Amino acid sequence: MVDMFQFAAIVLTALSMSVHFGTWLTEAPIRETSSGAVFTEIQKGRDRVASRVMPILGNAAILLVAACVFLSRTVPIAFGLSLAGLVLIAADMAVTLTCNVPINKQVQGWNASAPPPVWAELRDRWEKFHTIRTVLIVSGFSLFTSSVVFFRVH
């Protein structure tokens, strides 16, 4: 049973992480050089999908990792790594909800052909917090996965 929880937690956390990492890797160069109109269209398009999928995916991943932390409590090193991973994954969610989502909601209300004069400042702020949350979830995923791969929990 532990193996099933660990497998599901790894898959869901990897999917969530891949959205953050893929966005950071592929869209950051476009955002840096694009016009306000292009930035707005990209953000609005991605967020139409992400705002529906990511809350479910992210919360399910956190719950499964939390279950794995509980199940690993008898193996101290696995417990510690899993718990550290969970804390970082939860911190990713906190940054997302308190920093990125409010900006996303603002952008959703913009007219792509006439973004507000402060669009570049909001883009840079969004990018800074996106980088932070990407580092958090990649680190959290790595710690959690190492607990599963290197330390057997029965």
PLM region spans:
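Interfacial segments of alpha-helical transmembrane regions
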Residues: 2-14, 70-71, 75-91
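Interfacial loop at the N-terminal end of multi-pass membrane proteins
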Residues: 4, 13-60, 105-124
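Internal alpha-helical transmembrane segments of multi-pass membrane proteins, especially GPCRs
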Residues: 10, 48, 55, 83, ...
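Core segments of transmembrane alpha-helices
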Residues: 57-68, 134-142
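Mid-bilayer segments of alpha-helical transmembrane spans in multi-pass integral membrane proteins
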Residues: 90-98
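Juxtamembrane boundary at the C-terminal end of a transmembrane helix
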Residues: 146-154
